[in-house]
Amino acid sequence: MNIENDRKGASRRRFIATAGAASLALAAAPLVRGQGRKALKVSVGRQPWAAGNSPVTRYMMDNKTFERYAGDAGYDLTVDYRDYPSAAPQVEAFVSGNLDFGMWGNTPIVRLIAQNQPIQIITVGEGHFRFVLATRKDSPIRNVADLKGKTVGALLGGDPYNVLTQMLRYELGNPDPKAFNITVVNTPTQAQAATIPGGMDAAVLIYPAFLKANAELGTVGIINSFGYTESHYKGPAGEGAGILLPSVKKSAFYPDGYYLHRSFWIGSRKIVESDPAVVTAFVTAQQDAVAKLSKMDPGKVSELAKKYWELAPELGAKVVEDDVLFKRGWCWPTEGDAVALLETSKSMVDGKLITKPLAWAQVKTAFALTAPLDKAAYDKTGGVPDAAGFHDKNAKDLRGAPVWEMQSWGERS
């Protein structure tokens, strides 16, 4: 279902005025509280089996920081946190109007923007997630070329499938699995996919699921989305783990890898326009959690997600250390993060997931309404990082000007 996204000039001016008032409301919290609080219930969808969003939201839940910051803005907030196994059921709830905040990756976000769904991108939810092409420990599949004629599990319509197409594109020259007689089986449940069940020769797994299956079942990795080999690899680049594959340097996403993974927090247009101060409170709570967790031992951070990851601290720490949120220590979207959506849309055309790539204007529009709300949270939490941090040339992730400075973003096609 396509929903028309009508943004008329007058409506935009009214919203900007409202957003500005919301920022002032946060600063003038004692006065607002004295006048009584507005009761509001919001729903927040999270993916606790994934990466950084899991410990971050757990921290927010345990410390009720979303509720507290909303209280500072004059709200008596009740938060309904919901656990989702993947993006698909979240997207369904969101499109049907039954979810206020959700978090999912590049691939479903691009599809929604392409369909003109009225999504508002708020912040980076997690990123630089490691996906592993995995198989059984006794499998003769040792490299990407060995997938020809085989059956591979991947979450259709999600990031794992897109990762697979990019591995095929740069290793074999074509992103379409059908070009190599590869049958792709949908794997909505990562725990099951990680067992490499009968009828499946290999699967693309998220890192927590791979680590658990590797430790308990002996599931082995072939290559990962960062462009490095895993322990079961044997091929033109050599044998064993830790070899940078030459083909990854051809990727538009390098040095991030074959795929520039970013998951974003999404807000419904209704909540963004009717209660912008609540959106700023959400962002403030997220940044508070990210800043605090980034300073903690990664193994202890992973303990917040142990119920879902089921990993010992030394293994959970690997997931935490990969995540761009904890590398940065902040959650603000930048030009580099927006580019991830633009470039992903191009690869999705190659993979026949959408018919044409997004226009740069479409990507920017998806961030536009929430940009002033992010800026309010940035100011409230101490303005970290400074301008130099956004443009750090030595950073190992793609950055750039923050979303509230998108007027300085370059022209792209």
Question: What is the role of each PLM region?
Answer:
Residues 50-51, 272-357:
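Secondary-structure end/capping motifs
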Residues 190, 198-308:
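Pocket-lining segment of extracytoplasmic ligand-binding domains
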Residues 41-62, 156-160:
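Extracytoplasmic "Venus flytrap"
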Residues 58-76, 162-184, 214-218:
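Ligand-binding cleft/hinge of the Venus flytrap
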Residues 346-413:
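Conserved C-terminal helix/tail region of periplasmic/extracytoplasmic solute-binding proteins
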Residues 136-151, 175, 274-277:
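Flexible hinge/capping segments at coil-to-helix
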Residues 80-92, 105, 178-196, 205-209, ...:
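Short helix-initiation/N-cap motifs at beta->coil->alpha
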Residues 1-14, 21-24:
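N-terminal secretory signal peptides
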